[in-house]
Amino acid sequence: MTTPGTFEIHATDGAARTGCLHTAHGIVRTPIFMPVGTVGSVKAIAPDDLEAIGAEIILGNTYHLYLRPGDELVARRGGLHEFNAWRKPILTDSGGFQVFSLSGLRRIAEEGVEFRSHLDGSKHLFTPEKVVSIQRNLNSDIMMVLDECVPYGADRTYTEKSVGLTTRWAKRCRDAYPKGAAGNLLFGITQGGFFKDLRTRSIGELTDIDFDGFALGGLSVGEPKAEMMDLLYHSAPLLPADKPRYLMGVGTPLDIINGIAAGVDMFDCVLPTRNARNGTLYTSLGKLNIKRREFAEDDGPLDPACSCYTCRTFSRAYLRHLYTAKELLAFRLNSIHNLTYFLDLVRGARAAIAAGRFAEYKRSFEAIYPEEVVA
């Protein structure tokens, strides 16, 4: 078995690249999209569904799993893979983004971040060491360091201090879990807000620490699309070429295409499943709102170009009926389709990169989503 953490690049096309990352629970082919299973399950989707649509890795949330059911309870059940019956790789984020989203319910200090649970108001402290310990209990294949995600609009003075804190926390995470200590991988998270020089500084400081991969954090937090893309194309090439690059929490299909074009390998976002539950579906012709009356007697498939179970089996009319009747099956069928769309997107990207035609592939998505194209 190849050592977990081995990252192989198979082909490049411009900055875009395709390869594979070896983990303790299998190989992840990149570029990859990771369905989000916040509390240990991808909403409305069973592990068998994920297998059927070709998911290779899913994401879990450290903050939520720590609060409920508790990381120690999960550890007693053999870890998250045994607990949720997903046998392929799992990435857990550090919970930092969720904690910092609590705003008035948290306090940041050198030691870590103190916060109150959104469930019952109980007080907790996340230190870098604690976050690593929680993720070790979950036994995820890829663990993330604790970082400070600054909000959009934070000034330079605050952001500069935050970069220093994120670096110190990252070092403490690495010290708490030395490289090669077990089969779990540990990724660093670069920050820097919306200042290019601070992004560059954060990347330099984090890459001096021997992490198994590196993430771009703090993007897609309310900033204009043009600003996000400018920072993405500035930052991604600065990350080590021989390690996997992860763009956290991003995003739309065209965001992912742009991320791949910038040299990013890994993506996650709640968008496909959240939009599925709201009746917004992604197709080869763009977004479709299944609630619209025009689909009430439409016997055609949701997307003729899609081969997922939903599109092979059911009509738009039936899907609209399920949604308007508030049937739970609508959530499952819509989610199967949207996740298939996102996974097909990265599968197509891998093929396009290998064939040397990624620029053409990118243009095809720009034609589908012209409103998202940044000049």
UniProtKB/Swiss-Prot annotation:
Gene Ontology MF term list: metal ion binding; tRNA-guanosine(34) queuine transglycosylase activity
Which cofactor(s) does the record list?
Zn(2+)
**Which residues does substrate bind?**
93-97, 147, 191, 218
The cofactor remark states:
Binds 1 zinc ion per subunit.
**Pathway entry:** tRNA modification; tRNA-queuosine biosynthesis
One term under GO cellular component = cytosol
Q: Which GO terms describe its biological process?
A: queuosine biosynthetic process; tRNA wobble guanine modification; tRNA-guanine transglycosylation
| Any Pfam family hit | TGT
Locate the active site: 93, 268
Asked whether the UniProt record includes tRNA processing among its keywords, one would answer yes
Q: Where is this region: RNA binding?
A: 249-255, 273-277
Instruction: Cite the SUPFAM superfamilies for this sequence.
Output: tRNA-guanine transglycosylase
Keywords, alphabetical: Glycosyltransferase, Metal-binding, Queuosine biosynthesis, Transferase, tRNA processing, Zinc
EC category name: transferase
The similarity annotation says: Belongs to the queuine tRNA-ribosyltransferase family.
What is this protein for, i.e. what is its function?
A: Catalyzes the base-exchange of a guanine (G) residue with the queuine precursor 7-aminomethyl-7-deazaguanine (PreQ1) at position 34 (anticodon wobble position) in tRNAs with GU(N) anticodons (tRNA-Asp, -Asn, -His and -Tyr). Catalysis occurs through a double-displacement mechanism. The nucleophile active site attacks the C1' of nucleotide 34 to detach the guanine base from the RNA, forming a covalent enzyme-RNA intermediate. The proton acceptor active site deprotonates the incoming PreQ1, allowing a nucleophilic attack on the C1' of the ribose to form the product.
Q: How does it assemble?
A: Homodimer. Within each dimer, one monomer is responsible for RNA recognition and catalysis, while the other monomer binds to the replacement base PreQ1.
Tell me what this protein is called: Queuine tRNA-ribosyltransferase
Which gene is annotated as encoding this protein in its UniProt record? tgt
